[in-house]
Amino acid sequence: RITADLTQYLDREVGPAHEREYWRIFDDLREELGYADYLGALQRYRLAYPHDSHLLAVSHFLVNYPFADRLFPRALDVVRHARQWGRAVILSDGDAVFQPRKIEQSGILSAVEEQVLVYVHKEQELEDVEQRYPADHYVLIDDKLRILSAVKEQWGARVTTVFPRQGHYANDPEALRTFPPADLTIDCIGDLLTVDQSRLFPAAGHR
């Protein structure tokens, strides 16, 4: 939804040509970094168009975006529900400023009692995750099959991967062809409220 809202805003504020240029920069940066960086793309846009009088307005739009209104239905309920299984932790990829703000503004930070880690590439930081949050078994929920596959390759049977087919990445045909299916595929994040716990934890006591 943020993509549609920002597209509409850019189209109105800077015009269709510059709107398309912003998204070209955004896509290039996402390919380079591996995550969506809206402010980083705006910084690069600024270098290309340093005299654009709308830059401040676009920055204000992003910083004050109502992320809490854009969560998937029942997402916070799922976070609270997951705390019955064990400690719920947000593992996120992103920049060091905007991503933490998104997590806080959406209400997720308080829902997980501030248990949040923001990496550049979280699938490369599993040793740090294990040190901070040791467990016999992990459950990883992500809409990127690439991430789920990479973590499964490293943790093996110690992790149950869950793939909600919801969001920008979830229906990427190339990813669906390239990577193996997750341990559990669900239609939407809210489905986790009714998933039997035995499908997530292979043996009693693994929490």
PLM feature spans:
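Active-site neighborhood of HAD-like aspartate-dependent phosphohydrolases
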Residues: 1-23
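Asp-based, Mg2+/Mn2+-dependent phosphohydrolase catalytic module
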Residues: 104-140, 144-207
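Short, acidic loop-to-helix structural element flanking the phosphoryl-transfer center
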Residues: 39-40, 44, 48, 59-90, ...
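Helix N-cap/beta->alpha junction signal
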Residues: 72, 92-94, 144
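Helix-loop "lid/cap" segments that line or gate small-molecule binding pockets
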Residues: 6-13, 36-51
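Short, basic/glycine-rich phosphate-binding loops at helix/coil junctions
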Residues: 50-61, 102-107
